[in-house]
Amino acid sequence: MLKFIGTGSAFNTKLGNTSAYIKENNTLLLIDCGELTFDRILSLNLLDDVNEVHIAVTHTHPDHIGSLGSLIFYCYFIKKIKPIFHAANSDFIELLEIMGITEEHCEFDNCAFDPTVVINSLDLGLYFMENNHVKELMTFGILLVKNPSLEEHEYIIYYSGDSCNIEDNILEAFVSGKINYLYQDTCKADYDGNAHLSLRRLAELIPVELRGKIFIMHTDEGFDFDKAKELGFNIAEIEGGIK
């Protein structure tokens, strides 16, 4: 299961930028790296006992990539680790190059040509799935498949990134049991044209009996956590608590 460095929306800085990770077998997989994330990584000592770093990002809004360059340079110059950046779109790599990051500092894995990533040390497959957030950017959710080489996977997680809905194919796979857990961008704000999914809409989409497999993240200020729990949803928890 995923652990979280932060669970807040762009302006809900009290909860930090939403960023998830898996740390096993001396390997760190980080999903998104917003403005506040690098500092939090250091305070949690997440790079201790790590010799392999994988980074995947869902899109290029600042609360998802704001400290990405600092993390890559720190890994390379201080930890002597060359991280692997799994990019769902070529623009993501171009953005790093504008920051002065080259293939000397970071291995670029351009998933636009092959959307399937296998991290052998974690026995984990990543699959980027285009979703719907804002018209200005290409944005992605990520399927995480444990034991991808086996016919019977240990589990399949869908991580929504930022999204104003749940794509039909993802929802169908979740309801049918093909996806075991869903981490979903959810907000209090509820209006036409919202770039995020409201709690009201989430409750309309997810049957009551399946809500225990949903973890709410990327919450905005004033989000009603008690109501979400009463509706049967889980809340993604920040590792080490709120700072």
Predicted regions: what they are:
Residues V50-I55, H105-C111, Q184-D185, N234-E239:
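Short hydrophobic/aromatic-enriched beta-strand-loop microsegments
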